[in-house]
């Protein structure tokens, strides 16, 4: 009987440890979710002195992404890549990347979730400017509308297409990052397909 109860306690402790580990690695532990004044939606952001500014930046860029996706769907409704974008974009699933994330931004499963670093450096708290984050968001939207995985020609064509359309509707102002590179979450953006021949 003693062996059975000891074994039971060991199993219970193991389950508790596993649950705590899962919780600590989850968004709920490392991000704080707050409602943005920009659009009234909830955004999960890293703990920092001014949570509202980070949530509002994500909300502003999300509004821009919604405008681009709507424009694409209205203007090019018969294109397969646009159909994918319209179908898979989930504006309610936008958040900040976890502090432990190896990626500066990512699209999970082609649109189920979008996450962005909103800082100029990996460890700092200085927020990135809205136009640069919009460029990164267009990059992630391009992954959603691209059937292939990675950065193949299909992706770059879609990215250039989105940038051009975002410029037309005044959502994004193209910047030549080769001439004026930008720091984004510890990396340097030094190319913009809008300026490629």
Q: Can you describe what each PLM-predicted range is?
A:
Residues 13-24, 31-35, 39, 48-128, ...:
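Metalloprotease/metallohydrolase-associated module, dominated by Zn2+-dependent proteases
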Residues 1-9:
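Feature marks short, highly hydrophobic, charge-poor N-terminal signal-anchor/signal peptide-like helices
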Residues 135-147:
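Active-site recognition of the HExxH zinc-binding catalytic motif
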Residues 44-46:
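An acidic/histidine-cluster motif and surrounding catalytic segment
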Residues 129-135:
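Alpha-helical scaffolds flanking conserved acidic
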């Amino acid at each position: 009987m003693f062996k059975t109860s000891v074994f039971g306690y060991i199993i219970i402790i193991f389950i508790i440890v596993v649950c705590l580990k899962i919780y600590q690695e989850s968004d709920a532990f490392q991000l704080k979710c707050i409602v943005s004044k920009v659009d009234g939606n909830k955004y999960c952001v890293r703990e920092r002195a001014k949570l509202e500014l980070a949530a509002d930046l994500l909300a502003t860029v999300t509004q821009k992404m919604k405008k681009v996706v709507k424009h694409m769907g209205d203007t090019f409704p018969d294109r397969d890549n646009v159909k994918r974008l319209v179908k898979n974009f989930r504006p309610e699933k936008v958040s900040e990347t976890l502090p432990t994330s190896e990626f500066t931004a990512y699209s999970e499963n082609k649109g189920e979730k979008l996450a962005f670093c909103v800082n100029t450096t990996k460890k700092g708290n200085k927020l990135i400017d809205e136009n640069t984050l919009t460029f990164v968001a267009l990059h992630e939207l391009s992954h959603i509308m691209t059937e292939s995985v990675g950065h193949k020609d299909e992706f770059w064509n879609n990215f250039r297409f989105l940038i051009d359309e975002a410029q037309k509707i005044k959502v994004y102002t193209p910047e030549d990052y080769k001439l004026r590179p930008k720091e984004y979450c510890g990396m340097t953006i030094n190319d913009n397909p809008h300026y490629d021949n």
